[in-house]
Amino acid sequence: MASKPDFDPNDPLDYSANLDYLNELVRAEPELYGIYKKDENGNELKDANGNRILDEEGDYSGYFRDIQWKNKAITELYYPGSVFKVITSAMGVDSGLANINTTFTCAGAYGVAKETYHCAGHKAHGTITLAEALRQSCNIYYIQLGQRVGSQTFYNYFDAFGITSRTGVDLPSETGFMQYYKANQLGEVQLASSAFGQAMAITPLQMCTAVAAAVNGGYLVTPHVVDKITDTNGNVVEEIGTNIRRQVISESTSDVIRQMMEYEVGNGTGGGKNAYVSGYRIGGKSGTSEQLNMHRRADGDYKKVASFVAVLPANDPEILVYVMLDDPNNARTDYSSILAAPVAGNIISEVAPYLGIATDGEDRSGTIVTVPNLVGTEWSNAQVQLNIQ
């Protein structure tokens, strides 16, 4: 091995992965991760009633490595949608052009050049602050914020957050073909659409590293899968460590973003309430965007991507969870706060205790909790209700 000239194949090294327990977790609760039985051609099997069959005994040793031999988190592009509003918020606050109480008015429709933009459901939010705009995911607010920030400043921050280059993760085949507008290409419409995440095609991991920088004090960090390498005696041969690429925003701006994201989840009362897990301070943001290929559904609307990003503890984040549902098959709603947020909450409920993430410090011992009657409730909805207790 040219890159490891001292490597002895007769004395193999071991590694400590940051996500080394996923196989155990998936096998324990396959329904949480949507693991279903498939035939030899990869088609999901169904029972006599047409329902998919959970695979509770499968071998998942390679599940996260070689599904189609493609890691979509770094090889495929998508429109981030409203999750990107976290970054636009950071741009406005850090540049001094906005603060948490800055107001704009949303009348439900907003014209830019020859285009007319709307919020979800054509809802008019009225005059609202930045904190409320993030919580209510107001497109029109963010268009106006983007206009105030301006094309050059917008692009400068966009680049600083690492979205114009590869993340540098230690995994193969990370794409470098992101699609975005440079400063001199950000016309009125391009800037308006970019401000709420519907004009740039990036990888999910790029969105994760950008959000991480927004909440960790402002530092863009290179992500790694391997934490350290040890020999057969347990001695650390190589420790990867933390590689800080640069500081993007100030500590004070990052503190504001953390507060706003926690307000979004709101202890089970905010716009991201379905990601809340009792005992933890969680920050989050939902996002619903159109698929990159712009394919249409049977109802004529574009196919969607529902996503949710969560960080915890919100006051001093240690982990980030990012859930993406590509063209979720749900006839009732496209809202990621309903579709993706509960998945994030379920993951947090399993991962946080395993990793020893600190709770909010409130002593709940001896507390009597009334469990709601969930008979007949869909599994995902029942899980959300139990997470809140």
Predicted regions and their residues:
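Ligand-recognition elements built from short beta-strands and adjacent flexible loops
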Residues: 279, 323-338, 345-389
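Beta-lactam-recognizing serine transpeptidase/beta-lactamase-like catalytic domain environment
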Residues: 1-82, 87-325
